Amino acid sequence: MAHAERTFIAIKPDGVQRGLVGEIIKRFEQKGFRLVAMKFLQASEELLKQHYIDLKDRPFFPGLVKYMNSGPVVAMVWEGLNVVKTGRVMLGETNPADSKPGTIRGDFCIQVGRNIIHGSDSVKSAEKEINLWFKPEELIEYKPCAFDWIYE
């Protein structure tokens, strides 16, 4: 696929606990994106500190790491045309109060501290996050049968 890119999406502990994993995956699949990798894990503090290293000096950093370490997460890599930008639109605003209905956060969240999902904010950060959470051999290449019906 020409100009395909990848993004990192993580369903946070509150999204897992609330049983929203299937709904979130469904939305990305129905949009036409291809799942490249997925794992269900209890993220270590070390991994989370690396993931959120850009926020390490912010006052909410310790609470963010604690929250993300409080339960299992679903880490995923999705691929498709403009998947980073489109994925962010699908997620909604970081603050659910600013998210439109029809977005994941607009439909399922109330507070910014429990916003159920993370998505890469740029192609560069997606590459960094994918490399942090996944080994190269965990990224699976395949062509979905609907591929030719989604892309020109």
From Swiss-Prot:
Catalytically driven reaction(s): a 2'-deoxyribonucleoside 5'-diphosphate + ATP = a 2'-deoxyribonucleoside 5'-triphosphate + ADP; a ribonucleoside 5'-diphosphate + ATP = a ribonucleoside 5'-triphosphate + ADP; ATP + protein L-histidine = ADP + protein N-phospho-L-histidine
Residues annotated to bind ATP: K12, F60, R88, T94, R105, N115
Entry keywords, A to Z: ATP-binding, Cell projection, Cytoplasm, DNA-binding, Kinase, Magnesium, Metal-binding, Nucleotide metabolism, Nucleotide-binding, Nucleus, Transcription, Transcription regulation, Transferase
Required co-factors: Mg(2+)
Any one annotated GO CC term: ruffle
Record: active site: H118
Region (Interaction with AKAP13): 1-66
GO molecular function, one term: transcription coactivator activity
Gene3D superfamilies given in the database record: Nucleoside diphosphate kinase-like domain
Primary residence: cytoplasm
Subcellular localization, as worded in the UniProt entry: Cytoplasm; Cell projection, Lamellipodium; Cell projection, Ruffle; Nucleus
Alphabetized CDD domains for the sequence: NDPk_I
Domain of life: Eukaryota
EC number: 2.7.4.6, 2.7.13.3
GO biological process: CTP biosynthetic process; GTP biosynthetic process; integrin-mediated signaling pathway; negative regulation of apoptotic process; nucleoside triphosphate biosynthetic process; positive regulation of DNA-templated transcription; positive regulation of epithelial cell proliferation; positive regulation of keratinocyte differentiation
InterPro entries linked: NDK-like_dom, NDK-like_dom_sf, Nucleoside_diP_kinase, Nucleoside_diP_kinase_AS
Function statement: Major role in the synthesis of nucleoside triphosphates other than ATP. The ATP gamma phosphate is transferred to the NDP beta phosphate via a ping-pong mechanism, using a phosphorylated active-site intermediate. Negatively regulates Rho activity by interacting with AKAP13/LBC. Acts as a transcriptional activator of the MYC gene; binds DNA non-specifically. Binds to both single-stranded guanine- and cytosine-rich strands within the nuclease hypersensitive element (NHE) III(1) region of the MYC gene promoter. Does not bind to duplex NHE III(1).
NCBIfam families to which the protein is assigned, alphabetical: PRK00668.1 (NF001908)
Subunit structure: Hexamer of two different chains: A and B (A6, A5B, A4B2, A3B3, A2B4, AB5, B6). Interacts with CAPN8. Interacts with AKAP13. Interacts with ITGB1BP1 (via C-terminal domain region). Interacts with BCL2L10.
Family matches, as PANTHER family: NUCLEOSIDE DIPHOSPHATE KINASE
Family the entry assigns: Belongs to the NDK family.
Protein name (record): Nucleoside diphosphate kinase B
Organism: Bos taurus
